[in-house]
Structure formats: structure tokens, C-alpha cells
Amino acid sequence: MKNTDERYSMATCCAGGQSLRSKYGERAPNIQLSDRQWPSKKLTKSPIWLSTDLRDGNQALPNPMTLQQKWRMFQLLVSIGFTQIEVSFPCASQTEFDFTRQLIETPGATPDDVTLEVLSPCREDAIATSVRSLKGAKQAILFLYLATSDNYRETVLQLSEAEWLDQAKRCVEYARSITKDDPENCRTKWSFGFGFEDFANARPEAALRLGETIKTAWGPSKDNPVILGLATSVEATTPNVFADQVEYFSRNITEREKVCISIHTHNDRGGAVASAELACLAGGDRVEGCLFGNGERAGNLDLITCSMNMFTQGIETGLDFSDLLEIRRVYEEVTNLPVHPRQPYSGDFYFRAFAGAHQDAIRKGLAKRGRLAAMPSGLTQMSKGMIINGTSNEKIPSSTWRVPYLPLDPADLGFSFDSVIGVNSQSGKGGIAWLIQQGLGFNIPNELAAHYSQIIKKRSVSLERGLAAEEICDFFLEIYDLKSSYNTQLLKRLHSGFSQTIDMQQELEDATAPANNAAMDISKTMGIDVHCTMASSHVISSHDGEQLSNVAFVQCEIEQTTPCVWGVGVALSREEAVNRSLLLAARRKPGTETPDTKTSVNAIIQPLEVYSFSQKA
């Protein structure tokens, strides 16, 4: 057995017998930028966003979108707020060309503030086709691209550097002649962009020469700058190296005010978002990407992650992801690609905490913020900074969001707080108590929460899966005998329609004294020894103070045996609620709180009556 030093001193042998260093080492171009400025900067404004879902995203699909699917995706992008959308590669297929024409020729299809962009190779025939596809557009971006690195130029294009620059100059001048300089096309407001394919592996001075050539050939202005796209076509370095490359280009290109630097990153090393963020610090003006990080190989930059990163720093992005679940649904239907449950912001598990310590921290953080009082059971919607629920319209606290383990308010993305807590065998009493509070309006005491959490953990282990919020609430009603006709009707009365917001912040009151008196009466009546060891209750009321009901929680010793049993009672009066909880506890034998858990793992949980909030009692 070799020791650690010996193992790390051995050269790794890659496929083909090459050493690791000779095969992969020192591939990134060397750039000297000792006076770099980007590390000391801070993002304070959003870049221009370009969606390339209909181009880069579409070409990466096993089954490219049909015209109908493209149309649906375009409408989705417009509804989100994208004002620059790359819609096609017109010379690639008739479908691409026809879709572009459909967007232009269909009245009202393209809003006045949306600019269509098409992508074209740096060839005159392809450029001509692309321009024809845009004929009649109110405003359009013609975007060419050309390989920039020596490797691509020599291997793929097989051109010298002089020939390469001449091709770029010739194609840009041709594009200009048939767009903004052509009287027949002058009604369209033309913008022009040029993509530096494999910029991340290009020599900095060569990229600059190409940029100057393009700028001179197009003739941009401050009001209509030329777009120069700097791409990590295949991510090859750490994000800081790419930031240095972008800053070098931004600082050295002449007439910088006439240039819009567009950042196009890929996720081959998992750093697409980080690379784009640092590139914006280094001078990037526009960011290109796809929803949910779709794109070739490991994907393009995820526009949702990048924009929400800025959103959570208080930066207005101009993009609306307040109904992210609906956006995800449309995306998955159109692309036939699933969104990973751990995807930042949009995955099913992004907000969800399973660990007990995390759940407890979230519960306490929300309570401190004062959100529990304003949170109804079920879906919470956001509208202009207000919580809307029935007739209640309460302002959210204006303090900075600081809830442990929740990077942002789930409601800002259209998620309900039911999505925050996930229960499995690792969960603690705090999260379970919170779900009961949200689902049933019961502020259960810590001792009961600890008792019930053990039951839930056993059930989770037995079923070999986590439990949904509705299951946990349903099981609570079953365990504590709250499914009787009387209780069900009362709970339905409390929850039906939610015409009023239930106050989730009701404080527990000690009810031990009245419970002990009632316990003595029950002992005489039933002929068993019932001793109340703990009792509490609280009012279930609306935010405007109307009392709706009472709930009581009692812990009892039956016939002086252990463990103690719990009873929960719901009634219109406190006294009746205490009595009912004692009666339910007295009927129970110690250790019988755990019913048969032989339930199919694949069983579909049916919503409980009390959760049908729209159903009138």
C-alpha cells in the first residue's frame, strides 16, 4: 500500500498512454492583466438578456421543436419579459425560415419592444437567406459568427490569420450593404452582432484585431452599438480567467461606447453562471443563455439562475419568474426535457428542507420575520409586494429577507410554503409542527410535536419514502381521532373557502387546571383512572379577531401506566374542546398511537376533505 505522498507523486496515465499534464495541462491562453479591475467591482444593474432557447436550445434537443412548439416557446419568452430573442438559424432548414416569417407576418405576434435575432454563418449565401427571413421586421439583429481561436481557425477553417480577417470584413460589409444601407430594407431598425466562437481559447490580440475589423466594417453608433459576442463555446478555464479575457478586450477595443459586449457561456465545467457574472463585472453588457440551462453538451447558461442570482441581490432584472412552476411546465412540455429536482430556484427540492435542524431554523426564521401570521394554508400568491388571500390584503414586512436556509421568499417564484418542509426519517418535530400549523391551524405544543414526529418517522421508514404535507395532516387527524363526523364538519367550516385568513400565531394557553377537574369527572363516569399531566389550548380565529373555534391538547396517564397518551379536541368552546380531548385520550390505551403502517409505497394520497378549501361546508 503506497502512502499519500507516493500516490500523488505518480503521474496519472490517460487514455493513449499520455500523462495528465501533457494531455490537458496549459491549454488556456496566457493573459497578463496584473491591474485587473473586475475583482473590486460589484454588480449593481442587470445586463441585457438574450434568450437563445429557440436556437442553441432547440438545436440541442434530440427532437427539435415543431413550428407549433416554437410558437409556444416564443410566447412564453415574451411573457417572461425577454426583449431580445434569438429565434432561428434561417439557412439551416425551411422550418427555421418559415418560423421567422410567421413571427413577422402574423399581426401582433411580436410586441413592439421585442427584437428578433437570427444567427448566420459568416458566408454571403447564408447571410442573404437570413436577411430575407427578417424582411419587414420592425427591428432585428443579424448575428454572424466565426471561429476565433488559432485551433479552430487552423483546424476547421484552414485559413491564415490574414485570410480570416478578410473573410470577416467581406461578410460584414456585405451584410451592411443588404440591410441598413439597402433602401428596400431601411424600414427595419437593423442591429448587428458578431460572435467570437471559442473566444475563451483565442489569443487576446487576435480577438482584438477581429473586433476592430468588424466595428469598422459595420459602422456602429452610440445609439446603435455593434454587438460583439465573447463566448466560452466549450468551457475550458476557471471563471476568473474568462473575466480577465473579457476585461482585456473591453479595455482595449477602441470606441468602447459603440460596442455592446455580449457574454455567451457554456456549462462544460459547471461554471456557466459564475463565468457570466464575473464577465459582467469585467465589462459584459449582454448575457445570452437558455431557460433551465438547456443547450449542447452540459448546456448553456441558465438564464433563470443567473437572473435570480441578481434578483436576490436586490437588482431589477426585467424578467418575471413569479410563476416559475408554470414556466417549468410549459418548458418541459415543449422540450420533453425534465428539470432536475436540485436545479437552482426551479427544482422541486430547491426550497425543501428534510433535516430536522434545518426545518426548525426555517420555522424560527419565518416566525421572527412575522410571516407565519400572514401565511394561509395552501398556495400563497404574490402581487405587487402584497400577500393576497381571500379578502385579506396584508403588507409584507419591509425588512431584509434573512430566513435561515431559505435564500429567497418562495412566494416570489410562486411556490407555496408547503414546498419548504419535506418530511422523512431525518426530520424533526419543528418542521412537522409547522406543517400541522399550516395545514390545520393547530399550534401544537412541543411535547405533542415530539410525540407525533416519532410516529411520522416510523411511518416514513415503513413506507421507505418521504411524506407529503397532506399525508402528515391527514395522519394527524387519524392518529388523534379527529375524523369523526362532528370534528370533520367543524374543520370544514373553518377551512372552506378561506373567506378569512386564519391567524397562525395563536398563543397556547395553559389548560391543566380545568382539564384536571374534567378528568376527575371522566374517571368517575368511565370507571378508569384518568390523570391529566399537561393540557393547553388556543383559539382558532381570523386576523380580524373573529373567534372561529377552539382546539385543546391534553396529555394523560391512564390507570397510572406509562407512556402517557395524547388527546386532541376541537369544539366551539374551550371547555368543550378540553372535554373532547380528554374523552379521546381516555379511550386510548398507552402505545396505541401508531396504527398499522402496511401501506403501499406507491399508494396515491387522496386530498383530505379539510384541504378542499374551495368546498363549502
From Swiss-Prot:
<dbReference type="InterPro" id="IPR036230">
    <property type="entry name" value="LeuA_allosteric_dom_sf"/>
</dbReference>
<protein>
    <recommendedName>
        <fullName>Isopropyl malate synthase gloH</fullName>
        <ecNumber>2.3.3.13</ecNumber>
    </recommendedName>
</protein>
<keyword id="KW-0028">Amino-acid biosynthesis</keyword>
<dbReference type="InterPro" id="IPR054692">
    <property type="entry name" value="LeuA-like_post-cat"/>
</dbReference>
<dbReference type="Pfam" id="PF22615">
    <property type="entry name" value="IPMS_D2"/>
</dbReference>
<keyword id="KW-0808">Transferase</keyword>
<feature type="domain" description="Pyruvate carboxyltransferase">
    <location>
        <begin position="47"/>
        <end position="325"/>
    </location>
</feature>
<dbReference type="InterPro" id="IPR013785">
    <property type="entry name" value="Aldolase_TIM"/>
</dbReference>
<comment type="similarity">
    <text>Belongs to the alpha-IPM synthase/homocitrate synthase family. LeuA type 2 subfamily.</text>
</comment>
<keyword id="KW-0432">Leucine biosynthesis</keyword>
<dbReference type="GO" id="GO:0009098">
    <property type="term" value="P:L-leucine biosynthetic process"/>
</dbReference>
<dbReference type="InterPro" id="IPR002034">
    <property type="entry name" value="AIPM/Hcit_synth_CS"/>
</dbReference>
<comment type="function">
    <text>2-isopropylmalate synthase; part of the gene cluster that mediates the biosynthesis of pneumocandins, lipohexapeptides of the echinocandin family that prevent fungal cell wall formation by non-competitive inhibition of beta-1,3-glucan synthase. The 10,12-dimethylmyristoyl side chain is synthesized by the reducing polyketide synthase gloL/GLPKS4. The thioesterase gloN/GLHYD exclusively interacts with gloL/GLPKS4 to maintain turnover of the polyketide side chain.</text>
</comment>
<dbReference type="GO" id="GO:0003852">
    <property type="term" value="F:2-isopropylmalate synthase activity"/>
</dbReference>
<dbReference type="Pfam" id="PF00682">
    <property type="entry name" value="HMGL-like"/>
</dbReference>
<keyword id="KW-0100">Branched-chain amino acid biosynthesis</keyword>
<dbReference type="GO" id="GO:0005739">
    <property type="term" value="C:mitochondrion"/>
</dbReference>
<dbReference type="InterPro" id="IPR000891">
    <property type="entry name" value="PYR_CT"/>
</dbReference>
<comment type="pathway">
    <text>Mycotoxin biosynthesis.</text>
</comment>
